[in-house]
Every structure is written in structure tokens, then in C-alpha cells.
Amino acid sequence: MTKDDILPKKSKAFAIEIILLYKYLKDEKKEYVISNQLLRSGTSIGANIRESLRGQSTADFYAKLFISLKEAEESEYWLELLNETKILEQEKFEKLYNECEEIIKLLMSIIKHRKK
């Protein structure tokens, strides 16, 4: 399995985790603002990766991957805020943050490799 195959699967799994976290934060913690931002950025990663696979051009492909990268970076920021304000438990934070970091590394690797 190549990085190109792994990335859509990892980003979709991450999106599912983010959706479940959003539901938990909304229902149990009564937190709506940051969790909504995280829901948007965390699910957008995989959507843009999926769109990149059907890009109309090389430029379109890279544009979608760069958007995915920015959304992943934004997701890390929201996760950090939820963790540092003690809304999100450390164990859950570390799991999601590490998954997001893996996605970022894969995206950066693909972008660098394809540009050569």
C-alpha cells in the first residue's frame, strides 16, 4: 500500500473520530464553538484529499493537497486549545493529535515527492 492509498483512509478515519468527538463535546461538555471549528477543519481534510484524486489538472491536485494541509494544521490548533483548556482529556488529545500529525507528514511527503 502506497502513501497515496493510505492518506485517504487515514483522513477518513480521522474525520470519523472528529465527528464522534464533536458529538461528545456538544452533548457531554456543552462546548459548541471550538468543537464546531474542529468539525469543519477535521472533516475537510479528507474531503479535499478525495477531491484531489479527481483533480482536473496537476495544479488542481496540488491546490487540494495544500488545502488539506492547511485544514490539518488548523485542526491541530483547535485540538491544542481543547486540551489546554482541559475540555479534552489528555489521552484523547494525544491520540487525535498524533493521527493528525501523521496525516500532515504524509501530505508533506506526497507534495514534496510529486514536485520532483
Positions of predicted regions on the chain:
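Short, C-terminally biased terminal segments at protein or domain edges
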Residues: M1-A47, E51, G55-K116
